[in-house]
C-alpha cells in the first residue's frame, strides 16, 4: 500500500527571524519563544521529543519539560525505564520542541545528568497525590498482561499510602539536559526558512545563521 502525501502542502506565513531579533543568550531566546508558545493555541507547549541512542538503536518519545534555567532543561521519569537505561549507557541526547502553530521549532543537542534527590523531591512533592501514586504503581517499560494489573497496583498504592505523604520513590527523579547546541527554526515562504544555531565554545555562546 502506498499513500501519496505529496499534495499536502501549505505556505509558511509567519514573520521571519533576523539576527538582530535574537537574544545573546539561547536561554533568553528560548524563554521568549516559550512565552509566545504558551500564549498561542498550542495544547502542550512544554511537550518535547527526547531522542536517545544505545547499542546502535535509536529511541524517541515525548516527555514534558518541567523547568529550565541557564544550566539546562529538566524532565522527570522512572530511573528503571528503558529511556533511563539508554541514558545511563549513552548520555548524549537531543530535544525537539515542535511549535507548529507558530511555524517554529527548537532543537537542542547536549547530554544529560541526574539532578539531586532534593531537587527531585521538591518537584515530586508538588505533584497531585494521584500522580505520586502512579509513580509508585507503574514499573515503567515492563510488560503488562492487561490494564487491570496496572489499576490493581494503583489501588494497592492508594491503600499503602492512605495516611500521610507519599514518599519519593528511589527509582524516580529528574534529568537535566545540558545543552551544547540550540537551534531556532522559523518557517518562511518558498521554504527559505530562517535557522540560527547557538553553539557553546570555550564557555561562550556563538550564534550562526544556517542555510535551510
Swiss-Prot record:
Q: What's one GO MF term for it?
A: FMN binding
Q: Does the keyword Oxidoreductase apply?
A: yes
The prosthetic group or cofactor this protein requires is: FMN
Q: So where does substrate get bound?
A: 66, 123, 127, 131, 191-193
Involved pathway(s): Cofactor metabolism; pyridoxal 5'-phosphate salvage; pyridoxal 5'-phosphate from pyridoxamine 5'-phosphate: step 1/1; Cofactor metabolism; pyridoxal 5'-phosphate salvage; pyridoxal 5'-phosphate from pyridoxine 5'-phosphate: step 1/1
Broad class of enzyme this protein falls into: oxidoreductase
Q: What EC numbers are recorded for this enzyme? A: 1.4.3.5
Note whether Flavoprotein occurs among the keywords: yes
Name the catalysed reactions: pyridoxamine 5'-phosphate + O2 + H2O = pyridoxal 5'-phosphate + H2O2 + NH4(+); pyridoxine 5'-phosphate + O2 = pyridoxal 5'-phosphate + H2O2
What does the record's cofactor remark say about binding? Answer: Binds 1 FMN per subunit.
Keyword entries, A-Z: Flavoprotein, FMN, Oxidoreductase, Pyridoxine biosynthesis
Q: Name one GO biological process term.
A: pyridoxine biosynthetic process
Cysteine disulfide partners in this protein: none
Annotated binding of FMN, by residue:
61-66, 76-77, 82-83, 105, 140-141, 185, 195
User: What does the function comment of this entry state?
Assistant: Catalyzes the oxidation of either pyridoxine 5'-phosphate (PNP) or pyridoxamine 5'-phosphate (PMP) into pyridoxal 5'-phosphate (PLP).
Concerning its family, UniProt says:
Belongs to the pyridoxamine 5'-phosphate oxidase family.
Subunit-level organization: Homodimer.
Name-wise, this protein is: Pyridoxine/pyridoxamine 5'-phosphate oxidase
Amino acid at each position: 500500500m502506498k499513500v501519496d502525501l505529496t499534495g499536502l502542502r501549505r505556505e509558511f506565513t509567519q514573520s521571519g527571524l533576523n539576527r538582530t531579533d535574537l537574544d545573546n543568550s539561547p536561554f533568553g531566546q528560548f524563554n521568549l519563544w516559550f512565552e509566545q508558545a504558551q500564549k498561542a493555541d498550542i495544547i502542550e507547549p512544554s511537550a518535547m521529543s527526547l531522542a536517545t541512542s544505545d547499542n546502535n538503536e535509536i529511541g524517541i518519545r515525548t516527555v514534558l519539560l518541567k523547568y529550565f534555567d541557564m544550566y539546562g532543561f529538566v524532565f522527570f521519569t522512572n530511573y528503571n525505564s528503558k529511556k533511563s537505561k539508554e541514558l545511563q549507557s549513552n548520555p548524549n541526547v537531543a530535544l525537539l520542541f515542535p511549535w507548529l502553530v507558530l511555524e517554529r521549532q527548537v532543537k537542542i543537542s547536549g547530554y544529560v545528568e541526574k539532578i539531586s534527590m532534593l531537587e527531585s523531591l521538591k518537584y515530586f512533592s508538588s505533584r497531585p497525590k494521584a500522580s505520586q501514586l502512579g509513580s509508585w504503581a507503574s514499573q515503567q517499560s515492563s510488560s503488562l498482561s492487561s490494564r487491570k494489573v496496572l489499576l490493581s497496583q494503583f489501588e494497592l498504592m492508594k491503600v499503602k499510602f492512605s495516611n500521610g505523604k507519599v514518599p519519593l520513590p528511589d527509582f524516580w527523579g529528574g534529568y537535566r539536559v545540558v545543552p551544547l547546541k540550540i537551534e531556532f527554526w522559523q518557517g518562511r515562504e518558498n521554504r527559505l526558512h530562517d535557522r540560527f544555531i547557538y553553539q557553546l565554545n570555550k564557555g561562550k555562546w556563538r550564534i550562526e545563521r544556517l542555510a535551510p
